[in-house]
Regions:
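N-terminal cationic and glycine-rich segments that engage phosphates or anionic surfaces
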Residues: 1-103, 108-450
Length: 450
């Protein structure tokens, strides 16, 4: 009953209600666009495209786009070009002084970085759109799916539409972030993944029931394992290391002032401070080796064949793919944590507010101490994150599970769903608490103030 009362409180806050409605509206627009087939494509021929993109790397890419990839939709590129552009810009920020300067300029610098990311997104789209169109005949089993034929007009117009679709999806994500609730880009990916989940489960259910007498028991075991992985993912996202902080309280007595010890508070340092971004970044990079191996200049060479065999098609359940994937997640976790947890700023803010960590001097020593703690908790956090990410490959080896359904047993799909859902709930929770209502994620009683 308390949860229902909390949901009612959400609609009592006008600003929060408007933000939620805007978010839902923009997500519906995105889902509608994912169903619109490119002009010139015969929709009746899309069955073979869907069957060739229901598992492996293409299956994951299709999940990221909410099924738009398999529908030859105007949103077939999804939001991944924007993610790729963000990765490139952040990596370049390490080596390029101009970008380093922008990162230190606060809001104005971030605005310029966003503009650079947008232009780079367009450039990536101009490369990916022709590649996607060129791959359609093979993915459709060689059928003549183009109603207008494979003419130059079709290719030119389709490239323009695909690039525009990606830009529009990017705009939707930014609007959700600015005017809605949650991180817009992550929400678009999460909604796309959720949209493909029922079909994957239905295929697994049909396969399990039709092939063995213990099919229902197998499905129940899979569901139990699935919920256990969700629980582990939630624990990873929510786990924090609390650092005690003491504040000096200044009081006046006669002609002099003195400091007395104030109340003790805590700085919550998250075990996984980088959230789901290392997973998204690593997954975006894992699409690259297979594409490189398939280039004309490499596809007949030993290197090209090895890249395609280990990083293309259904290789995402293979050994080399998951070793590289796990290592990339660990590296990106450290990289993104360094960006999102500014220990220098935390130490300066603590010093200015009269706070200090017991036994640690304010200023530089505090910053170094926080850096040390973050390094200690980021290692197990990143390893745990990597283990959950590669778990689909493990469960495929242990149990006879459909590859499309296995993607939801940990891995990128589940971690994105859990991480984004918790992040969105926390943002809604902060709105409720600021207005003195019980939060969605708060267990204690928090009465509304008059």
């Amino acid at each position: 009953m308390k949860f229902i009362e909390t949901l009612k409180n959400v609609w009592k806050i006008t600003e929060l209600k408007d933000r939620i409605m805007l978010t839902l509206g923009l997500l519906l627009v995105y889902r509608f666009g994912a169903q619109v087939v490119l002009p010139g494509i015969d929709a009746s021929q899309l069955g073979s495209l869907a069957s060739n993109t229901d598992s492996g790397i293409l299956g994951l890419l299709n999940a990221f786009t909410g099924g738009a990839f398999a529908k030859a939709s105007v949103f077939a590129l999804g939001i991944m070009p924007y993610i790729s552009a963000s990765i490139v810009v952040q990596l370049m920020g390490i080596a390029i002084p101009y970008l380093q300067k922008l990162q230190k300029e606060g809001a104005s610098g971030q605005k310029k970085i966003t503009q650079i990311t947008r232009w780079l997104t367009i450039g990536i789209c101009l490369v990916q759109a022709p590649a996607y169109l060129a791959s359609l005949p093979a993915l459709m089993g060689g059928t003549q799916a183009f109603m207008l034929g494979q003419s130059g007009v079709f290719y030119f117009s389709s490239v323009i539409i695909l690039v525009t679709g990606c830009i529009f999806a990017m705009w939707l994500g930014e609007k959700i972030t600015d005017k809605g609730v949650g991180n817009g880009i992550s929400l678009l990916i999460m909604v796309g993944i959720i949209a493909t989940m029922p079909l994957s489960f239905a295929q697994e259910f049909d396969s399990a029931v039709s092939q063995s007498q213990g099919g229902l028991i197998k499905i129940l075991i899979e569901i139990v394992i699935w919920f256990a992985i969700i629980l582990a993912s939630v624990m990873l996202v929510m786990a924090v290391r609390r650092i005690a902080v003491q504040y000096a309280r200044r009081t006046a007595s006669g002609s002099y002032e003195k400091n007395i010890m104030g109340s003790r508070q805590y700085i919550p340092l998250k075990l996984n401070a980088s959230g789901v971004m290392p997973i998204i970044f690593a997954q975006a990079i894992m699409f690259v080796p297979g594409l490189i191996g398939g280039l004309d200049i490499l596809k007949d060479s030993t290197v090209g064949q090895w890249l395609v065999a280990n990083f293309g098609g259904n290789s995402m359940f293979g050994l080399w793919y998951n070793i590289v994937f796990g290592l990339l997640i660990i590296v990106f976790t450290y990289f993104y944590t360094a960006i999102t947890v500014p220990t220098n700023k935390m130490a300066d803010d603590l010093k200015r507010s009269g706070g200090f960590i017991p036994g640690i001097r304010p200023g530089t020593e505090t910053s170094e101490y926080l850096d040390k703690i973050m390094s200690q908790i980021t290692l197990p956090g990143s390893v745990f994150l990597a283990l959950i990410a590669v778990f689909p490959a493990i469960i495929v080896q242990i149990m006879d599970i459909q590859m499309g359904w296995a993607l939801f047993f940990g891995g990128t799909s589940l971690l994105i769903m859990v991480g984004v859902a918790i992040d969105t709930m926390q943002q809604i929770n902060s709105y409720l608490l600021n207005k003195h209502y019980d939060g969605l994620m708060k267990t204690g009683k928090n009465r509304k103030l008059a």
